[in-house]
Each structure stands twice: as structure tokens, then as C-alpha cells.
């Protein structure tokens, strides 16, 4: 399963990797800010300079993936063909390995048959293939790590072993160093298990504290580095105020309109250089909040549009938008269909027992929340795609089982009617 998934993704890489070798804007298409930071690390400049000049330390992105890319650059060269192929191959490997937690999560809750179908669906899952083979970013590693976090959670409520809870905390902290969005759901999942242990009368306090301390232990070196570099506490990454600015401005034709990023326009780039990163982010946060205060009704509307986009892929049918996003119409059908089938599977899981459904509900409620209020990207939902796959498969197989049972009932009724008629 894993080898077939890897082979498919690597085959797609062969067609898509050349676009990352475009030298325009000093190879910006090769991993954007992550590529810049990785280059700075290789040059001995530290974790710094996410844009077009040496601008000093940064917390623009979380550290794990830039460090990984820096390792690739160190071995294969900066912005080389070999580096592009190597990092895309690693992304493909992360995506292929996600088959394992997908299979195990499905098996834990829904049995072997659902697990096999879920694993194989992940092998051929379009989002998984495309983002692994074409997108040099933390996304596929985030997907793998979050799937592992979720898998560990499913076993956590059954144990009070301190080592298991420490493992959960360490894994969650490590995953957050790759993508902080993990922390939008992991604490709530841990709290749910903690509560379940408490209700059952099992040991709960020490395991919970151990998990929290493990998160702190894993993430604190990065926090200490940030405090040393910027003189204030910055957890994981420090550009949340800027993310508000990107999605809350006078342009609503796109979910992330161009012209508001230091990589897009000279004006934003100059402001970043003049104010420094923390000053720039604070300034953009103030601009975003001022806009929101002046346009409260629009902000509510935009928030609702972002909710719809996350779950259906729909933003607009406007000519300008579809010219920018030409594949959105087929994506809307696929994304919406997947969501509907997933919700059917979630409903069936809730009928089986709320204890089964609640971890999924926690993730679906908490994970995308920050994107509703800032701005979404097409890759933001990818880390929870494994849960969509598992529940969608369970929904389809449950529907098939119900239809088969209904058909058998009808056949039995017809046979009984014929038997009664013959007796008469």
C-alpha cells in the first residue's frame, strides 16, 4: 500500500517538478519563504530572512520544515534540480506513509474492512497526490504528524501509563513545530481523553500534567530562541496579525487576494524592511483590526464565506476569480461531495457511540477555526483529510450495508407473500 502510494506520487513529480526551478524573483517558486530561510541556514545566517534580502531573525514560519529543507540544500545544493527532486520525494514519502495511520485509525474504530478501503483510498486520494508531488511546504509532513497525533489519542484514554501520555505530548509539540495549527485541536483531544479517564475513575491528573510538560519540553527551545532574538514571547510562529491582514481588506474577490504580501508588492516589502518583522506584523494587525471595526457586517459575511470555502471549496463564480482559479468548479464538486459523505459517516459513527464520534467532532470544530477569522488557503484543510477519508469510507460502506439489508428485507417479504398466497 505504502509503496504503491509512493510510486504514484513520484510518477507525478516527474511531470511537475520543473516549475519549481523557475529562477524568477530569485527562485521564489521554490518553497517561497521556507526556501529563503533554508538558504539562510545553509549560508550560516541562522533562521532568518524569509524574503528578498538579509533582514535578520524570523518567526514567519515554524522551524521544522525549513530545517529539513536546509538539510536537503546542504546535501544537494541550494535551489538545484537535485534539491527539488529530493524534497518532493520526501513530501511524497510523508504522504505515502500516511496510509499507515489512516489504516490504523479506521481499524481502531470501524474494523478491518473499513481500514483496508480507507488505506487504499488514501493511496489514490487526489489532494494527497497533488500536494505531495507539487507543493514544497510543510503540508504533507503536517498531515502525517496530525494523523499520528489522532491515532495516539484513540489509544490514550485506555491507558494511564505516564510514558504514553508523555509520548502524546512530545508528538503534539513536535508536530506543532512543523505547523502550529496542530495546537488548535491537540489540546482539546488530550483534554477529552483526560476527562474520560477522570469519569472512569482511572488515574488522570499525573498523565495529563505529564503530557503538558512534554509539550513544553519539546517546544521550549524554540520559544527561548524567539525570546532571545526578539525580546518577547513568540510561540511557534509570529505572523498571525499579518494573516488577519491578508484576509480582511477591501479586496474580497479572492480568499487570499494578491497585493498584500511582501512577496507580491514593493510597498509591502519596503514596509517589512523599514519596520522589521515584529513591527510589520503589529502594523498589519492594527490595519486589519481597524478595517474589521469599520466594516463589521462585511467581516461577518467574509467569515461565513470562509467557512463555506473550507468545507465546500466554493468562493466565487466571478469571471476574475475563475480566471485565477480555473480548477475550482471541479474541485467544488469533489470537495463538497467528500464533505457530505464524510458527514454521513460521522452521523453513523455517532449512532455507534458518541465516544467514537467526539474525537472527530473536536477536530472538525477546532482545527479550521483560525482560518475562518483570518483567511483560508487551498492547502489548509489537508492535515485533516485522513479523517475525511476514514469517515467517507465508513459512510459509503454503512450506506451499502443498509441498502443491502433493506433489499434482503424486501425479498423476504415478497417470498413470505408468495408462500402465503400458495397456502391459500
Task: Indicate residue ranges for each PLM-predicted region.
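Short helix- or helix-capping micro-motifs
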Residues: 5-8, 115-126, 144, 151, ...
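Perimembrane helix-loop-helix junctions
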Residues: 155, 185-216, 223, 396, ...
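Loop-to-helix entry region of an early transmembrane alpha helix in multi-pass inner-membrane enzymes
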Residues: 59, 63-67, 77-100, 119, ...
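Membrane-proximal stem/loop segments at transmembrane-domain junctions that anchor or position
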Residues: 227, 233-309
Amino acid at each position: 500500500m505504502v509503496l504503491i502510494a509512493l510510486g504514484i506520487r513520484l510518477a507525478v513529480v516527474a511531470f511537475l517538478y520543473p516549475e519549481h526551478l523557475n529562477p524568477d524573483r530569485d527562485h521564489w517558486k521554490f518553497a517561497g519563504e521556507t526556501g529563503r530561510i533554508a538558504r539562510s541556514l545553509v549560508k550560516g545566517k541562522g533562521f532568518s530572512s524569509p524574503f528578498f534580502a538579509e533582514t535578520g531573525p524570523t518567526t514567519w514560519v515554524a522551524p521544522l520544515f525549513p530545517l529539513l529543507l536546509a538539510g536537503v540544500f546542504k546535501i544537494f545544493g541550494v535551489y538545484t534540480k537535485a534539491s527539488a527532486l529530493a524534497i518532493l520525494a520526501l513530501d511524497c514519502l510523508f504522504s505515502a506513509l500516511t496510509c499507515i495511520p489512516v489504516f490504523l485509525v479506521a481499524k481502531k474504530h470501524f474494523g478491518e474492512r473499513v481500514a483496508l478501503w480507507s488505506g487504499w483510498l488514501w493511496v489514490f486520494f487526489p489532494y494527497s497526490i497533488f500536494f505531495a508531488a507539487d507543493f514544497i511546504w510543510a503540508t504533507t509532513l503536517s498531515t502525517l504528524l496530525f494523523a499520528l497525533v489522532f491515532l495516539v489519542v484513540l489509544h490514550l484514554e485506555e491507558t494511564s501509563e505516564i510514558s504514553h501520555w508523555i509520548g502524546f505530548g512530545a508528538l503534539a509539540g513536535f508536530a506543532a513545530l512543523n505547523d502550529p495549527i496542530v495546537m488548535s485541536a491537540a489540546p482539546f483531544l488530550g483534554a477529552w481523553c483526560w476527562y474520560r479517564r477522570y469519569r472512569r475513575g482511572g488515574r488522570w491528573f499525573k498523565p495529563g500534567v505529564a503530557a503538558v510538560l512534554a509539550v513544553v519540553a519539546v517546544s521550549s527551545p524554540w520559544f527561548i530562541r524567539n525570546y532571545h532574538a526578539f525580546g518577547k514571547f513568540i510561540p511557534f510562529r509570529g505572523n498571525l496579525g499579518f494573516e488577519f491582514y491578508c484576509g480582511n481588506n477591501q479586496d474580497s474577490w479572492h480568499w487570499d487576494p494578491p497585493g498584500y504580501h511582501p512577496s507580491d508588492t514593493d510597498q509591502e516589502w519596503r514596509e517589512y524592511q523599514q519596520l522589521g518583522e515584529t513591527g510589520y506584523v503589529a502594523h498589519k494587525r492594527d490595519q486589519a483590526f481597524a478595517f474589521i471595526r469599520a466594516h463589521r457586517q462585511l467581516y461577518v459575511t467574509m467569515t461565513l464565506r470562509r467557512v463555506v470555502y473550507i468545507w465546500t471549496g466554493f468562493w466565487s463564480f466571478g469571471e476574475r476569480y475563475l480566471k485565477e482559479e480555473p480548477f475550482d468548479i471541479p474541485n467544488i464538486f469533489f470537495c463538497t461531495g467528500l464533505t457530505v459523505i464524510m458527514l454521513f459517516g460521522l452521523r453513523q459513527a455517532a449512532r455507534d457511540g458518541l465516544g467514537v464520534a467526539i474525537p472527530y467532532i473536536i477536530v472538525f470544530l477546532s482545527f479550521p477555526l483560525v482560518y475562518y477569522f483570518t483567511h483560508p488557503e487551498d492547502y489548509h484543510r489537508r492535515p485533516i483529510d485522513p479523517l475525511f477519508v476514514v469517515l467517507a469510507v465508513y459512510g459509503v460502506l454503512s450506506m451499502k450495508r443498509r441498502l443491502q439489508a433493506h433489499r434482503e428485507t424486501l425479498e423476504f417479504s415478497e417470498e413470505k407473500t408468495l408462500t402465503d398466497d400458495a397456502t391459500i
